[in-house]
């Protein structure tokens, strides 16, 4: 069994310095993979209760709901920073991207 981590792609840890340290530390510690999530856009206002917080508030909105790094660009950068750890996309919102350009980007990712 392998264990992995989620790369911070938004919030206070989503800085180049922090992501580099986290990714390289995970590789040194023997983790098997790093996952990167995908969020193209988050609405400014959500009226329905969010089921994953006690208050029902969607916590991303506390910081303006933006600032998410682009998934495949971050995965490419992680590939450049590491050598052995596997890289995974958690969920990819494919309809928001040109499928041919995305396929080419993914194929080029680990050169």
Which functions belong to the PLM regions below?
Residues 80-83, 111:
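Solvent-exposed polar/charged
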Residues 61-64, 88, 95:
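Residues at structural and domain junctions
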């Amino acid at each position: 069994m392998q264990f992995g981590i989620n790369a911070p792609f938004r919030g206070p840890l989503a800085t180049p310095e922090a992501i580099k340290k986290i990714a390289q530390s995970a590789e040194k510690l023997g983790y098997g993979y790093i996952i990167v999530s995908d969020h193209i856009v988050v609405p400014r206002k959500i009226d329905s209760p969010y089921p994953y917080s006690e208050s029902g508030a969607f916590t991303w909105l506390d910081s303006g709901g933006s600032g998410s790094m682009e998934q495949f660009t971050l995965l490419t950068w992680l590939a450049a920073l590491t050598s052995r750890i596997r890289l995974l996309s958690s969920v990819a919102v494919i309809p928001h991207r040109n499928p041919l350009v995305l396929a080419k980007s993914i194929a080029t990712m680990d050169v």
